[in-house]
Curated annotation (Swiss-Prot):
The gene is ylbK. A motif (GXSXG) lies at residues 39-43. Coiled coil: none annotated. This is Uncharacterized NTE family protein YlbK. The active site is at S41, D153.
Length: 260
């Protein structure tokens, strides 16, 4: 009997995107196989590691060992504070230098052309370059120059890239939304100002947008900052718990598709 192709759309959200690891962990534990992934920003980073064949346990170790200061390659702030070379090197290493089209799971990576406002979806070529473009938070990272374009964070045009996995051929689409805005009183760093501003803007866009996913997973992340990696285990657990609650619904979607 034919099986539906399951697509997973991983949304942006800065550090909160680590909750995607919990989503992937739950799906794996319940033997729900993901056939294709699309990601914006942190969703692209997590998706690229998983598509390269890393299991969630390995990805958790990488996340817990992450120290933002080690990857903060500051530069004179003309177009952004961070060059992003160290993050690119990290992605290159953990995706084994492979192009997107050679990863174990088909992957779509979303970025935005800063000059035209066009959504750019990478389905082939360098994984590390595409992810570097997708995480280029305006004002923080220098935009990525690639193929004659100046590219910034995919979340600017598509925070939860459901349409991308649909175009990739998914029959059932699961989306992970980590866009809940943290209610904060104090911004202690310019990064906090930029991230909170982006969060508020994009949270409003998501709130007023119809997202055509069959299953929408929304981990409870309101108390966590998008710019802080201090609560990694808690954010991963939130993603896993939210997905566990949706497993029966996912199974029903699969059963209904098979019976149609």
């Amino acid at each position: 009997m034919a099986k539906p192709k399951i697509g997973l759309a991983l949304g942006s959200g800065g550090a909160r995107g680590l909750a995607h690891l919990g989503v992937l962990s739950s799906l794996h534990k319940h033997q729900i196989e993901v056939d294709m992934i699309a990601g914006s920003s942190m969703g692209a980073l997590v998706g690229s590691f998983y598509a390269a064949g890393h299991d969630v346990a390995t990805m958790k170790k990488v996340a817990k060992a992450f120290k933002r200061r080690l990857y903060a390659d500051y530069t004179v702030p003309k177009l952004g504070f961070l060059k992003g070379d160290r993050v690119r090197q990290l992605v290159h290493a953990y995706t084994f230098g492979k192009p997107i089209e050679e990863l174990q799971i088909p992957l779509g990576i979303v970025a935005c052309d800063l000059q035209t406002g066009e959504k750019i979806v990478f389905r082939k070529g360098s994984v590390s370059d595409a992810v570097r473009a997708s995480i280029s938070i305006p004002g923080i990272f220098i935009p990525q120059r690639l193929d004659g374009r100046l590219l910034v964070d995919g979340a600017v045009v598509d925070r939860i890239p459901v349409s991308v996995v649909k175009d990739m051929g998914a029959d059932i689409i699961i989306a992970s939304d980590v866009s809940r805005v943290r209610k904060t009183e104090t911004a202690v760093h310019i990064f906090d100002v930029i991230m909170q501003s982006m969060d508020i803007l994009q949270n409003e866009l998501v709130r007023h947008q119809t997202i055509a996913a069959d299953i929408m997973i929304r981990p409870s992340l309101e108390t966590y900052s998008s710019s802080s990696f201090a609560n990694i285990e808690e954010m991963i657990s939130a993603g896993e718990e939210a997905t566990n609650r949706m497993i029966s619904k996912i199974r029903k979607e699969i059963e209904n598709w098979e019976g149609s």
